[in-house]
């Protein structure tokens, strides 16, 4: 039976209603998605403003000793948070501000008598007698700058001949050529290159600016000359020290690593804009002499980390960030950086909800704050690593267990940053408790991040390395300079000692040990005074 026109119209209307409902549903989903994107962008803007204009510290001052809460305001306990015993922090005494004399006590002092009175001024106004000195006092102190200077030294070689044999068929001669030049064919001395290296790697002063400074001293030393000599000296004299430090590092059981991108212009078969990497590999908090090494590689492949640690005994502890490439390092106990976890959670707290302890981001962050508070208290009390091991198991393990329980049930909802934080933490869940196994294990990767900072600061000034050889030389100088800093040495003096002593691959480890920054003689010669 044919449908009537009314039936056809009714069917068409139903189809139209169905289409409209689908359109409404699609539009509602689009609106919800755009609203979520809008909220995420607002949160991103708030985070960027905080990064640009707010405090960079992740710590929050407690209102009174022992308070583990993060934010000021009414005290509310976060939902389902366990509360282990609180460790009270000792009250810090404010350090007394040093006097002017104390600030500059290590500077050489010269006393200059004041003599501005004429002979007439020194006649007594009552009786007319000539006055005599009866006492002195210091009326002011000034710091005077003496501009550095460069000198040209000409070494004169004397030739000696035998007076008895001079008229024979075999006259005898000998010439005193002295010590070989620091760098063959170059006028650059040990002291000059020490200054150039100190200014570039200690003060982050680029070579083009040093070139201008030398011109003011009537010395046209080009940046290309400086760069060439820096590379040559690094290869000849710093590489043996670096290899010695590396051998020492492979005997250690607690290590830390980090990496950062750099630009190297003239790498084979690679565009100049391609990222290369500097790595820092350093010893951890084991109470032994710190060793800090830098390494250059064209890529970020985890194989580079594995290759650098080749030869180390299995079972060592490695603290690193979340980069998966570190998984290439086999037979190691991986530790997770709790500072990274705390940072992710802090950045996921929505603006205006800092006091809302029902917010999952705040809850997760409070767990981290409690752990950091315990760690600070252990350092304040001066606990040794055995005591730290015991206290961590008693204080911190229950907190981490509560954190893991929170992690299993937490719902990030529409908070994109919290989703990212949760994913980051879950990918590292198996490493969260590794540091509890030994009191010498680091709780965070802050030490290696602090060690990689000179690279990032220098990168802003140097901008790039021209060649792989230059990049490798940079890592050698950074190693020497940062090692000197770790032992409180005068950077220029230590560089100068190494260049004057000229370490070589022919030296034994016992000989190289005498040039290490932890050597007592080196400490005395390179003290900051």
Where are these regions (language model features)?
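Short, flexible loop/hinge motifs at secondary-structure junctions
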Residues: 1-184, 227, 256-257, 320
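Catalytic center-proximal scaffold of phosphoryl-transfer enzymes
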Residues: 2-6, 121, 159-161, 166-529
């Amino acid at each position: 039976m044919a449908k009537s026109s009314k039936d056809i119209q009714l069917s068409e209307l139903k189809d139209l209603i169905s289409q409209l409902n689908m359109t409404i549903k699609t539009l509602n989903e689009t609106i919800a998605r755009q609203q979520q994107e809008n909220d995420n962008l607002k949160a991103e803007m708030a985070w960027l403003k905080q990064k640009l204009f707010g405090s960079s510290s992740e710590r929050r001052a407690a209102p009174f000793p022992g308070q583990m809460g993060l934010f000021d305001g009414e005290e509310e306990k976060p939902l389902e948070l366990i509360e282990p015993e609180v460790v009270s922090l000792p009250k810090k005494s404010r350090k007394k501000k040093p006097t002017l004399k104390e600030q500059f006590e290590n500077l050489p002092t010269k006393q200059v008598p004041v003599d501005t009175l004429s002979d007439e001024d020194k006649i007594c106004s009552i009786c007319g007698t000539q006055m005599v000195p009866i006492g002195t006092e210091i009326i002011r102190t000034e710091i005077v700058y003496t501009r550095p200077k460069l000198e040209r030294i000409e070494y004169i070689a004397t030739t000696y001949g035998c007076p008895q044999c001079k008229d024979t068929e075999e006259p005898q001669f000998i010439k005193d050529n002295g010590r070989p030049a620091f760098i063959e064919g170059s006028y650059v001395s040990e002291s000059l290159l020490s200054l150039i290296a100190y200014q570039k790697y200690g003060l982050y002063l680029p070579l083009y600016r040093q070139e201008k400074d030398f011109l003011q001293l009537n010395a046209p030393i080009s940046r290309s000359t400086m760069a060439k000599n820096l590379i040559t000296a690094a290869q000849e004299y710093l590489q043996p020290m670096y290899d010695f430090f590396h051998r020492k590092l492979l005997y250690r059981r607690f290590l830390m690593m980090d990496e950062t991108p750099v630009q190297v212009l003239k790498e084979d078969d690679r565009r100049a804009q391609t990222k290369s990497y500097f790595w820092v590999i350093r010893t951890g908090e084991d109470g032994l002499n710190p060793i800090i090494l830098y390494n250059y590689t064209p890529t970020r492949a985890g194989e580079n980390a594995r290759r650098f640690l080749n030869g180390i005994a299995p079972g060592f502890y490695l603290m690193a960030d979340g980069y998966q490439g570190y998984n290439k390092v086999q037979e190691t106990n991986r530790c997770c950086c709790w500072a990274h976890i705390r940072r992710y959670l802090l950045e996921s707290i929505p603006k205006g909800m800092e006091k809302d302890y029902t917010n999952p981001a705040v809850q997760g962050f409070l767990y981290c704050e409690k752990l950091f508070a315990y760690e600070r208290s252990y350092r304040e009390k001066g606990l040794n690593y055995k005591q730290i091991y015991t206290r961590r198991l008693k204080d911190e393990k229950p907190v981490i267990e509560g954190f893991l329980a929170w992690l299993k049930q937490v719902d990030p909802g529409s908070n994109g940053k919290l989703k990212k934080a949760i994913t980051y933490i879950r990918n590292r869940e198996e490493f969260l408790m590794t540091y509890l196994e030994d009191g010498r294990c680091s709780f965070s990767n802050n030490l290696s991040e602090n060690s990689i900072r000179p690279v990032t600061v220098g990168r802003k000034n140097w901008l790039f390395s021209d060649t792989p050889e230059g990049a490798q030389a940079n890592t050698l100088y950074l190693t020497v300079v940062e090692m000197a800093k770790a032992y409180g040495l005068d950077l220029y003096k230590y560089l100068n000692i190494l260049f004057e002593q000229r370490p070589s691959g022919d030296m034994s480890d016992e000989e190289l040990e005498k040039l290490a920054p932890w050597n007592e003689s080196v400490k005395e010669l390179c003290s900051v005074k």
